[in-house]
Amino acid sequence: MRALVLAAGKGTRMKSKIPKVLHPLSGRPMIEWVIETAGKVAQKVGVVLGFEAELVRKALPEWVDVFVQGEQLGTAHAVMCAKDFIEPGDDVLILYGDVPLISENTLKRMIEEHRKGADVTILVADLEDPSGYGRVIQDGDKYRIIEDTDLPEELKSVTTINTGFYVFSGDFLLRALPEIKNENAKGEYYLTDAVNFAEKVRVVRTDDLLEITGVNTRKTLVWLEEQLRMRKIEELLENGVTILDPATTYIHYSVEIGMDTVIYPMTFIEGKSRVGENCEIGPMTRIVDCEIGNNVKITRSECFKSVIEDDVSVGPFARLREGTILKKSSKIGNFVEIKKSTIGEGTKAQHLSYIGDAFVGKNVNVGAGTITCNYDGKKKNPTFIEDGAFIGSNSSLVAPVRIGKGALIGAGSVITEDVPPYSLGLGRARQVVKEGWVLKKRKEE
């Protein structure tokens, strides 16, 4: 089985410089949804590109065969551009890059039906308002498809539509393609004409509107996004996740969340994030591509491409940037930013700190206002803080620098040299007190 994805269209009605198939749906380009599903049912996958072909090609996996349709002259013309992909002894599944939610189950039903002996198998649906769609007309055991623009008045009441999804016998398709003409209202080469040439046609029906909805406008894309969002929320609710306000919660379809986790309002969980069991996430929190363990609490914070182990507390108002690893039972508090750093088990950084390019050991106390000065104007430098160290408030650690095990840094210090284990590090001017100075100054005035 081969699958050919037609994705050459510009998407004029999207009013965008971005190719239509690259617009995201639940965090992934539309065409990525189609390629993934195609790869589950077919041994080879090909894609026909057109508008901004090179840009779309970069978004495709390397194992996909790519063909280019220089001028968009219809669906049959697109398939002709990939003629070398079609093998006489193999079946071909036709999919579309802007119809992203076609299901694996439906495609398997089509393939199974086709293998009962057909030149072509069509996926059809019945719509209350079929306007704009080609109609599937049955005459005994024969079927033909008429495009909406070419439909005679007496057939406009037919509600069975052609979804555009087909399985063709490779032998039949190679014979039919040269016979297709562009004698229609739009002057295009329609793949539906190949169906009309077929002697053996089989039909599979779907009643799932989502999987046959094509995206031609941003309005449709937003509608699909909302339907997919609610499907995901319903799935999570059924699997033991509490979502306090579904109306303000946005969770991408690829996200995994464990049971007894509570999601508070205004929370966004995106990408390939995985959240463990018995967590509290939100409110007003955004999580992107993170691995989160069990019993984690994150509130009013942002976390990007980070790993958060069990029993960790984050926030409020913390920011975890890419490359952050928070070990078990660590605590990150308000207005703390961490970038490309590992925070050891039981370590606390609870107030107003920046930790970047650092390796912090176990049970370290990072005092309020601590800054790792990692950038020297040319490159980023590392800071090492070993187990059990105590960093006093308002300290600046000028990297590269190492704070030894159990060392103590006095509050307000600027540390520019390594501090050995169990040592006191001070880097500040001695306090000066001038008794009675204020009263004396007032008298002078």
From Swiss-Prot:
GO terms for cellular component: cytoplasm; membrane. CDD domains: GT2_GlmU_N_bac (cd02540), LbH_GlmU_C (cd03353). The keyword Lipoprotein does not apply. Residues 240-445 are annotated as: N-acetyltransferase. Residues 1-218 are annotated as: Pyrophosphorylase. PROSITE patterns: HEXAPEP_TRANSFERASES. UDP-N-acetyl-alpha-D-glucosamine binds at residues 6-9, 20, 69, 74-75, 96-98, 134, 147, 162, 216, 321, 339, 354, 365. Residues 219-239 are annotated as: Linker. Binds 1 Mg(2+) ion per subunit. Gene3D superfamilies: Hexapeptide repeat proteins, Spore Coat Polysaccharide Biosynthesis Protein SpsA, Chain A. Keywords: Acyltransferase, Cell shape, Cell wall biogenesis/degradation, Cytoplasm, Magnesium, Metal-binding, Multifunctional enzyme, Nucleotidyltransferase, Peptidoglycan synthesis, Repeat, Transferase. One of its GO terms (molecular function) is UDP-N-acetylglucosamine diphosphorylase activity. The keyword Cell inner membrane does not apply. Its EC number is 2.7.7.23, 2.3.1.157. Homotrimer. Catalyzes the last two sequential reactions in the de novo biosynthetic pathway for UDP-N-acetylglucosamine (UDP-GlcNAc). The C-terminal domain catalyzes the transfer of acetyl group from acetyl coenzyme A to glucosamine-1-phosphate (GlcN-1-P) to produce N-acetylglucosamine-1-phosphate (GlcNAc-1-P), which is converted into UDP-GlcNAc by the transfer of uridine 5-monophosphate (from uridine 5-triphosphate), a reaction catalyzed by the N-terminal domain. PANTHER family: BIFUNCTIONAL PROTEIN GLMU (PTHR43584:SF3), NUCLEOTIDYL TRANSFERASE (PTHR43584). This is Bifunctional protein GlmU. It comes from Thermotoga maritima (strain ATCC 43589 / DSM 3109 / JCM 10099 / NBRC 100826 / MSB8).
